[in-house]
UniProtKB/Swiss-Prot annotation:
Protein's organism: Geobacter sulfurreducens (strain ATCC 51573 / DSM 12127 / PCA)
SUPFAM superfamilies according to UniProt: PLP-dependent transferases (SSF53383)
Enzyme Commission designation: 2.6.1.62
Residues bearing the modification N6-(pyridoxal phosphate)lysine: K287
Protein name: Adenosylmethionine-8-amino-7-oxononanoate aminotransferase
The protein's assembly and partners: Homodimer.
Family statement drawn from the similarity comment of this UniProt entry: Belongs to the class-III pyridoxal-phosphate-dependent aminotransferase family. BioA subfamily.
Record localization: Cytoplasm
Binding residues annotated for pyridoxal 5'-phosphate, in chain numbering: G118, S119, D258
First-level EC class: transferase
Length: 453
């Protein structure tokens, strides 16, 4: 492929690419950063400037960019087989990966249904739960419980179980209705508690009330375990997830865990559900499954869920769902190489020290005048900016303070993305101690510059 100069690439980009979650009028008036290389925790633009990737290529990168072992696995697979369908066939890489996923997943999740992104992985889970109850002779169980501030993707089924009006409101007429429960947001408690210490898990009490009032009609509950991602990296109080599992058991509701963002070591455990010792009935995976290299997703289910779909063909119990690139051998080979690196690098064993260091560095930010909250779960962190710390008054969204802080961070060699007034910290798990220092120091300087305090 020939090399093109930066300005040519910028011009072609503005002429031809429609970027996600982007106001293109502003984009067309900007000078986009063109990334051409990656190395470890860094991305490098067409002019040679290096940026610490503080968002792990949008919450996907695990072992760093351009990791040799993964590159070699991908190259080797390209020379063997690029793609083969799972409709009527199987392939060796998909088989081996499914076995390994079942071995490391929360106990009981033993069946793997492949797709190609997080939204579809969630939709697969929703459709499984819906059809499951029909096969069980309970078609009245057809509704879903979702949470405020939830985000499960951008396809219509995933949007239906989401809860972010900024993203989803315009599509409301296209969506199926869900039953929405309050999600815990300890900094801005929906139950009016002043401090996390005063938390009495009223969100669980309200969830149980909702389940009781819709007894016999709920097929499944969809939840982001431990952390609500796009809602603002909102960390759930300890015990909430386990409480949700207990309520689902009590009311005969399938629990669907969306681990698309939090899976594969991000919370300090291989899977977030493992932090509270629970097994969902269905679990959606993507993003980190290939360490940020390839589009691949998987929806894991228990034997009980799977068995409900077994029968003679004429019984029409087949799960009629699939995607062209389901179980793609290239993606599966990369995912296997990533799992190998988890073991050879002893990555999970190294995370506690990194998590602690990040926690210590973030403590300094809470003293800043316009930092209202700093929250963290594993290698996920968020800094919520406010106009007034005492009242928690947020900055007006029109001021775009979060965007301005992230743009300023680029001048300090750090690439970040905001969620409104919330600055997200989500680096590759392979980040070093020195790079954690660099990231947080750059963020602190940027907050000072933009907010003046």
């Amino acid at each position: 492929m020939p090399d093109y100069d930066t300005q040519t690439l910028r011009d072609w980009d503005r002429r031809h690419i429609w970027h996600p979650f982007t106001q293109m009028k502003e984009w067309e008036e900007s000078e986009p950063v063109v990334i051409v290389e990656g190395e470890g925790s860094w991305i490098i633009d067409s002019e040679g400037k290096r940026y610490l990737d503080g968002v792990a290529a949008i919450w996907t990168n695990v072992h760093g960019h351009c990791r040799r072992e993964i590159n070699e696995a991908l190259k080797a697979q390209v020379d063997r087989l690029e793609h083969s369908t799972l409709l009527g066939l199987t392939n060796d890489r998909a088989v081996v990966l499914a076995k390994r996923l079942a071995e490391i997943a929360p106990p009981g999740l033993c069946k793997v249904f492949y797709s190609d992104n997080g939204s579809t992985a969630v939709e697969v889970g929703v459709k499984m739960a819906f059809q499951f109850w029909r096969h069980e002779g309970k078609p009245e169980k057809s509704r879903f419980i979702s949470f405020t501030s939830a985000y499960h993707g951008d396809t219509l089924g995933a949007v239906s179980v989401g809860g972010i009006d900024l993203f989803h409101g315009v599509f409301r007429p296209l969506l199926f209705p869900t039953i929405q429960a309050p999600a815990p947001y300890c900094y801005r408690c929906p139950m009016g508690r002043d401090t996390p210490a005063a938390c009495g898990m009223e969100c669980l009490t309200e969830l149980e009330r909702i389940m009781e009032s819709h007894a016999g009609e709920v097929a499944g509950l969809v939840i982001e375990p431990l952390v609500q991602g796009a809602g603002g990296m909102i960390v759930q109080p300890e015990g909430f997830l386990k409480g949700v599992r207990e309520l689902c058991d009590r009311h005969d509701i399938l629990m669907i865990a969306d681990e698309v963002a939090v899976g594969f070591g991000r919370t300090g455990a291989m899977f977030a559900c493992g932090r509270e010792g629970i097994t969902p009935d269905i679990m959606a995976l993507s993003k980190g499954i290939t360490a940020g290299y390839m589009p691949l997703a998987a929806t894991l289910a228990t034997q009980q869920v799977y068995d409900a779909f077994l029968g003679e063909y004429r019984e029409m119990k087949t799960f009629f769902h699939g995607h062209t690139f389901t179980g793609n051998p290239l993606g599966c080979a990369v995912a296997l190489a990533s799992l190998d690196l988890f073991e050879s690098d002893r990555l999970l064993g190294k995370l506690p020290n990194k998590i602690k260091l990040l926690q210590e560095k973030l403590k300094g930010l809470i003293e800043l005048e316009h930092v209202g909250d700093v929250r963290q779960c594993g290698m996920i962190a968020a800094v919520e900016l406010v106009r007034d710390r005492a009242t928690k008054e947020p900055f007006d969204w029109e001021e775009r303070v979060g965007v301005r802080v992230c743009l300023e961070a680029r001048t300090h060699g750090v690439f970040l993305r905001p969620l409104g007034n919330v600055i997200v910290i989500f680096p590759p798990l392979a980040i070093t101690a020195e790079e954690i220092d660099f990231l947080v120091d750059g963020l602190e300087k940027s907050i000072h510059t933009v907010t003046g305090g």
